[in-house]
């Protein structure tokens, strides 16, 4: 930040014409006598630590004013002091921050000329040796500002409503205990690479893209099928719940004050770039686009709660290179994102319960057992303690509770549900949050019957968490399975037909055609390989149902089927079935779940290797 400080007899300004980034509701004309005029250019470097830039600038202004013996301050945005300016939104945040810090100083009279206006001004400089000073502010170079300590209190609430010491649970060897150990800061497991990293490649699902930025992946047909089915699944859940799908851009202009302020909440882990002379960012969630839609809508309280949903493909977070790993932490990911505009806090609490129930259900449907932590401010807990106990009771399992002494984010309450990986580390997936800032920030409002303007609470909900983390959790969960498998509805191949000899291939193809027509993903291993090798490779592909086709099967029409989920290690479970019984068995397992056809050739002889 660049400051030009002029001790003046008099300064006055008049705002004449708006620019496209002009502050609204600005004071159009003002003046001060015996004042320190502070001409200020907020620079791009200030965006790295706005809080520190504000603190240092305010300290410099206060020190200079006291040295000059004045308590009147005029803050004047003056872009001409620098050629490397911050985004307009960040600049406004800094200027408001400086104003707020100075207003809180005893005896000071503070005025601020508006940002983003063409202004006329007149200034009378006193002309003494200290009347013209310049300062350069670099965030992080001054003495560290004392940070207000946020207190965190942890405890467990049981479904019966009892409050328990969280540390007592940490001694157990359970998924819930693993979550508690992580939240309480216990030393975690180190060194071992997550199980899913090898599996995601071995199963030809997904792998790193070496020609892209780290944390950006390429998806093979088998992985793409699973990813698409999961997306279909979430869409079905959202539509059943009354959500309305939308689609919004992946990039946003940081010159918009609301965008810049919301982006600043997430710190430096953002992809930012220049588009001409505009500072842009890639979204890290679908909030920006949905809030923009809500801002432009005419909202009637009779339409609330209103739920908008987007499968955010892609969202971007510039995670530290050393933290990027597999499908757990990426820089580009797919986030199912629903935002619910509620009428009031009672409506938000009701919707929160409903969406939490959806989150628990996704863990069951995806066969990824979940554990939960509920976080809120102390004020919220004191007001809604009975409600918190109620959602734990409805969940039917104990939950870790974290109570914060003050609000530090846009939410006052949130729940995070997590699967536990093979090393005992949480994989946070579904979440629901009560946002009490964004409606104000983006001017999302409705009018009550008495004409009162209302900026209502907004729920953020990802019913599953990112699609990549869901697959991560499923793969990690297989480490505890004696015979690892995908849920049948997600298996890239649901039935594999293994002809014993070349003469059986035509019969196998006929069955394969009928199975696919019945809505079952089936393929035929027609390669010139031994039956044992074909069966072994079907096992490596985690195919749920494998049927060997020989002379007897061709004659009788009955198939000897190996059922993976009922098998034990080195002890396959086999059952004789008719073709219709096989169809019925698969349909029973996949009932109510989305279906997509094979993404790979039906004949394995025509299937390429990707990895």
Swiss-Prot record:
The keyword Transmembrane helix does not apply. Catalyzes the attachment of threonine to tRNA(Thr) in a two-step reaction: L-threonine is first activated by ATP to form Thr-AMP and then transferred to the acceptor end of tRNA(Thr). Also edits incorrectly charged L-seryl-tRNA(Thr). Keywords: Aminoacyl-tRNA synthetase, ATP-binding, Cytoplasm, Ligase, Metal-binding, Nucleotide-binding, Protein biosynthesis, RNA-binding, tRNA-binding, Zinc. Its cofactor is Zn(2+). The N-terminal domain is an archaea-specific tRNA-editing domain that hydrolyzes incorrectly charged L-seryl-tRNA(Thr). Catalysis of tRNA editing is performed by the charged tRNA itself. One of its GO terms (molecular function) is ATP binding. It is found in: Cytoplasm. It catalyses: tRNA(Thr) + L-threonine + ATP = L-threonyl-tRNA(Thr) + AMP + diphosphate + H(+). Binds 1 zinc ion per subunit. Pfam families: HGTP_anticodon, tRNA-synt_2b, tRNA-Thr_ED. Homodimer. Zn(2+) binds at residues 287, 339, 460. It comes from Methanoculleus marisnigri (strain ATCC 35101 / DSM 1498 / JR1). GO terms for cellular component: cytoplasm. GO terms for biological process: threonyl-tRNA aminoacylation. Its EC number is 6.1.1.3. The gene is thrS. This is Threonine--tRNA ligase. Residues 195-487 are annotated as: Catalytic. Residues 1-145 are annotated as: Editing domain. The keyword ATP-binding applies. CDD domains: ThrRS_anticodon.
């Amino acid at each position: 930040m660049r400051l030009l400080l002029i001790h003046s007899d008099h300064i006055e300004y008049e705002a004449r014409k708006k620019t496209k980034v002009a502050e609204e509701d600005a004071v159009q004309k003002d003046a001060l006598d015996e004042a320190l005029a502070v001409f200020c250019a907020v620079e791009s470097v200030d965006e790295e630590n706005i809080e520190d830039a504000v603190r240092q600038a305010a300290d410099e202004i206060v020190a200079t004013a006291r040295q000059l013996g004045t308590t009147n301050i005029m803050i004047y945005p003056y872009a001409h002091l620098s050629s490397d300016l911050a985004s307009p939104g960040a600049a406004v945040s800094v200027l408001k921050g400086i104003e707020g810090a100075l207003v809180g100083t005893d005896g000071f009279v503070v005025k601020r000329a508006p940002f983003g206006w063409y202004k006329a001004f007149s200034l009378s400089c006193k002309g003494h040796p200290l009347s013209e000073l310049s300062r350069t502010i670099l965030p992080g170079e001054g003495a560290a500002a004392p940070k207000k300590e946020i207190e965190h209190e942890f405890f467990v609430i049981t479904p019966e409503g009892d409050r328990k010491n969280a540390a007592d649970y940490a001694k157990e060897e359970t998924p819930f205990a693993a979550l508690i150990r992580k939240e309480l800061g216990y030393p975690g497991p180190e060194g071992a690479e997550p199980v899913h990293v090898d599996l995601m490649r071995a199963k030809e699902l997904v792998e790193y893209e070496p020609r892209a930025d780290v944390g950006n992946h390429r998806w093979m047909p088998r992985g793409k099928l699973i990813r698409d089915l999961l997306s279909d699944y979430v869409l079905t859940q959202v539509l059943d719940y009354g959500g309305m799908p939308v689609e919004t851009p992946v990039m946003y202009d940081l010159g918009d004050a609301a965008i810049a302020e919301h982006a600043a909440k997430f710190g430096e882990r953002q992809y930012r770039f220049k588009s001409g002379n505009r500072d842009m960012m890639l979204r890290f969630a679908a909030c920006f686009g949905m809030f923009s839609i809500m801002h432009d809508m005419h909202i009637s309280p009779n339409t609330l709660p209103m739920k908008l949903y987007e499968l955010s493909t892609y969202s971007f977070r510039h995670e530290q290179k050393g933290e990027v790993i597999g499908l757990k932490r990426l820089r580009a990911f797919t986030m199912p994102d629903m935002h619910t505009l509620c009428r009031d806090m009672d409506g938000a609490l009701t919707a929160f319960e409903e969406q939490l129930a959806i989150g628990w259900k996704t863990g069951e449907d995806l066969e990824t057992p979940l554990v939960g932590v509920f976080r809120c401010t102390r004020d919220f807990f004191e007001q809604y303690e009975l409600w918190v106990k109620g959602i734990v009771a409805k969940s039917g399992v104990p939950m870790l509770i974290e109570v914060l002494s003050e609000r530090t984010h846009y939410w006052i309450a949130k729940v995070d549900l997590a699967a536990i990986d093979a090393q005992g580390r949480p994989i946070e997936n579904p979440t629901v949050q009560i946002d009490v800032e964004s409606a104000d920030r983006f001017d999302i409002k409705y009018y009550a019957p008495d004409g009162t303007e209302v900026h209502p609470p907004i729920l953020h909900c990802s019913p599953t968490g990112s699609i990549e983390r869901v697959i991560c959790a499923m793969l990690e969960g297989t480490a505890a399975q004696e015979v690892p498998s995908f849920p049948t509805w997600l298996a890239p191949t649901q039935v594999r037909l293994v002809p014993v000899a070349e003469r059986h291939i035509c019969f196998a193809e006929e069955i394969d055609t009928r199975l696919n027509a019945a809505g079952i993903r089936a393929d035929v291993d027609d390669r010139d390989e031994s039956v044992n090798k074909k069966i072994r490779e079907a096992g490596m592909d985690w195919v749920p149902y494998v049927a060997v086709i020989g002379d007897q099967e061709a004659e009788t029409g009955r198939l000897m089927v190996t059922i993976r989920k009922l098998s034990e290690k080195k002890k396959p479970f086999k059952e004789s079935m008719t073709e219709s019984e096989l169809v019925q068995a698969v349909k029973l397992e996949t009932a109510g779940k989305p279906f997509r056809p094979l993404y790979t050739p039906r004949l394995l002889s025509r299937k390429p290797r990707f990895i």
